[in-house]
Amino acid sequence: IPLCLVGSEMCIRDRGGKGANIIFKDADPEAIERGALRCFRNSGQSCNAPTRMLVEKSMYEEAIERLKKYTESFEVGDPKKEGEHIGPVISETQYNKIQTLIQKGIDEGAKLVAGGTGKPDGLDKGYFVKPTVFADVNNDMDVARTEIFGPVLSVIPFETEEEAIKIANDTDYGLTNY
């Protein structure tokens, strides 16, 4: 990451991400779960996490059902514990930001498929976030435009390859697309 000098202040430039994972109707159906896993890894705290999943309309309902099942079975727990699961986010400030953005997604009309606000059951200590999936998102909603830096996946339907590319490229964060 490049360093810069501004007056007498040193700063580090960050390259954020709001990557899109494009799923076409002829894709391996397991690409849906793999995309969710890539979003949720590290509790979503990766600037290259594919946090927008663009799904071709002809397989959209199947994708939403698969995401619901997968996300509801996804484990959250102590990072010292053996096994596949995600741990807490970095701080109370980040936890609160994620909770605010999840609520904003609900308020803006995105359909909550799995997860939501609050902590996962049994995890009262620490800043644990429920892996969350929103359906029926459009690219103008905050959950699609803001780098949440948490385990929150926004699913956006598309009809044509050109439309998918247009949506994928319509972001202020150009770090990655899948």
Tell me the role of every PLM-derived stretch:
Residues 1-7, 11-12:
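Single conserved hydrophobic/aromatic residue that forms the stacking wall/gate
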Residues 16-18, 45-52, 68-100, 117-128, ...:
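Flexible, acidic loop-helix segments that line cofactor/substrate-binding pockets
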Residues 17, 56, 67, 105, ...:
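Residue-level signal for inorganic ion chemistry
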Residues 19-25, 36, 49-53, 133, ...:
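Adenylate-forming
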Residues 22, 75, 102, 121, ...:
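Conserved C-terminal structural/oligomerization subdomain of aldehyde/semialdehyde dehydrogenase
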Residues 28-37, 57-75:
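Conserved core segment of the aminotransferase class I/II
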Residues 108-114, 173-178:
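Bilobed periplasmic-binding protein-like "clamshell/Venus-flytrap" ligand-binding domains
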